[in-house]
Each structure stands twice: as C-alpha cells, then as structure tokens.
C-alpha cells in the first residue's frame, strides 16, 4: 500500500507502475490522481474522525489537528466519485494514535472503522475489499515497562469484526495491519563510541552517533535505554549523552544515570529497529 500526503504526480504514477494500492490522503486527491495517473481498479482512502482520541499518545492524540486523512463526508463523496471514475474495489485506512501500549487501542480503532465501513457501504454501494488498521500498536521503551498482549488485542479486533461487520453482511472484508514498530523495534540497536567527556554545569558524554542516526529522542524527547558494554555495572553518574550536531536537542539521554564511562567505551542504544 502506498500511503502518502502532498504527493507529487510522478510518485502517484510510479505507485501505479508498481501495482501498489494507492491510499488517498485527501478528498482533493481524487481529481489530482485522475489527472496524474488515472484511477486504478483498487483504491483506498484515509479517514480522520476529528476530535481528540483518548487512547492516543503525545506523538499523535488529536486527529482534528492532524494533517492526515479526510472527514467522513469527504470519504463518502470520494468513494462515490471514484466509483463513477472506474474504481471497483475499495479500502478504508486510519491511524489515530502512535506507539500505544494498551490492549484497548486496536480494538477501539477497529470498532470505529467497522462502524464507518457499514455506513459507507450503505451510502455508496461500493464493494469494500479491505480495512487497514495501520499501525499504532507500540512497545514500551522502558525495560521494565508493561507490554502489549497481541493475543488479547487480536481477540478484541475479532469480537468487533463479528459484532459489526459480520452482522452487517460484510464478513468477507479483509483486515490489513502495519505493525512495523511492534515487530521490529526491539530488534534494532544503535552502537556508538564515547569520543569525548565534558564537564560544565552537567556531565556530557559525546558519542560518534547523532540525531541523524536516531531522531526520536531529539524530535519527541523519547526514552531509549542505553547500556555501556564495557562497564555494564559499577559506580554510576548522571550524564547527558549527546551527538555532534549543532543543535541543542541532539541528545540521546538527558540526566540519565549510567555507569561511569570513559572515552572509547561502547554504548548500545536499544529498541532502534523502527521509527529511527
């Protein structure tokens, strides 16, 4: 699936050449896609319900302020126009929160999208081929933190499917997911060396990696666990672990307790396998 926003014409054309399922971000993209690359047989639209999503996180929790997706009325109108332009199979996509650590997020998202799907099919008569629940199921970056239970999450989605879609005669609709962070984030590591140690109002460990290699801490203030492979235990100190970019937010850790480190030590920054 090709999900994008503010998409250049040549990228829509390339997606069509690849045979990718295009996921339109905006109602206005219907006319744009028609001129840029033509309307494919299978197409999807991204939904934004507006309001505040109570199960959201600081990364994404306010759909009304998000630049992604279209309103319900826009999505319904888009489906009508796309059908008239030759589209035969349709999908619905939404991402309402990012990196949730809650077994409730996916089932609640599913419930909202399944109810939307029933209404959309009723008002447009389209053949709904799939619903893409996207991502949002995250990991706990704190080593001792609570984790998602994917079996419980899956059961919640299944219950919503049977109660809403199956009951409405839509039991053939496929469900897609995009659980990249959940599957991959724990299995990536950023390995870096301590190159400098500086003492002013704080103690700084300068390393040979930077926000160029891992942006989350600089962008979101996100926590990533750090291990000193040369000194995993022993006396500790409070440090900032920083890169060399000329930006004061180029920091992997702020006021973090780590074993006393020396120049040349190898640090491992954990859980970097996704959204780096």
Language-model region placement:
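Conserved active-site and cofactor/substrate-binding residues in soluble primary-metabolism enzymes
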Residues: 28, 70-73, 77, 104, ...
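Anionic group-transfer/hydrolysis microenvironments
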Residues: 27, 48-50, 95, 134, ...
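Charged (often Lys/Glu-rich) extended helix/loop segments that serve as interaction or gating elements
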Residues: 170-276
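Active-site-proximal beta-alpha core segment in soluble small-molecule metabolic enzymes
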Residues: 1-130, 139
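Acidic, glycine-rich loop-and-beta core segments that form the ion-binding/anion-interacting portion
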Residues: 107-168, 172-176
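Conserved protein kinase catalytic core
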Residues: 52-54, 141-142, 184, 214
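Short glycine/threonine-rich loop-to-helix capping motif typified by GTGT followed
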Residues: 102-109, 140-153, 184-196, 254-257
């Amino acid at each position: 699936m090709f999900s994008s926003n503010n998409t250049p014409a040549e990228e829509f054309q390339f997606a069509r050449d690849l045979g990718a399922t295009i996921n339109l971000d905006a109602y206005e993209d219907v006319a744009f896609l028609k001129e840029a690359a033509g309307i494919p047989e299978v197409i999807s639209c991204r939904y934004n319900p507006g309001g505040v999503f109570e199960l959201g996180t600081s990364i994404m929790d306010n759909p009304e302020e998000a630049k992604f997706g279209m309103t319900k009325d826009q999505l319904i109108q888009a489906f009508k126009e796309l059908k008239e332009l030759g589209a035969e199979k349709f999908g619905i996509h939404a991402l309402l929160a990012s990196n949730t650590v809650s077994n409730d997020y996916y089932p609640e998202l599913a419930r909202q999208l399944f109810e939307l799907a029933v209404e959309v099919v009723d008002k447009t008569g389209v053949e709904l081929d799939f619903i893409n629940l996207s991502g949002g199921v995250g990991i706990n970056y704190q080593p001792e933190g609570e984790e998602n239970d994917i079996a419980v999450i899956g059961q919640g989605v299944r219950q919503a499917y049977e109660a809403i879609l199956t009951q409405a005669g839509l039991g053939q609709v496929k469900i897609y997911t995009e659980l990249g962070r959940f599957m991959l984030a724990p299995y990536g590591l950023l390995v870096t060396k301590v190159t400098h140690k500086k003492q002013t109002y704080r103690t700084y460990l300068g390393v040979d990696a930077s926000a160029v290699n891992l942006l989350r801490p600089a962008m979101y203030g996100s926590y990533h666990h750090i291990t000193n492979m040369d000194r995993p235990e022993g006396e500790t100190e409070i440090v900032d672990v920083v890169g060399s970019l000329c930006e004061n937010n180029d920091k992997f850790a702020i006021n973090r307790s780590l074993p006393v480190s020396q120049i040349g030590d190898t640090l491992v920054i954990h859980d970097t396998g996704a959204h780096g």
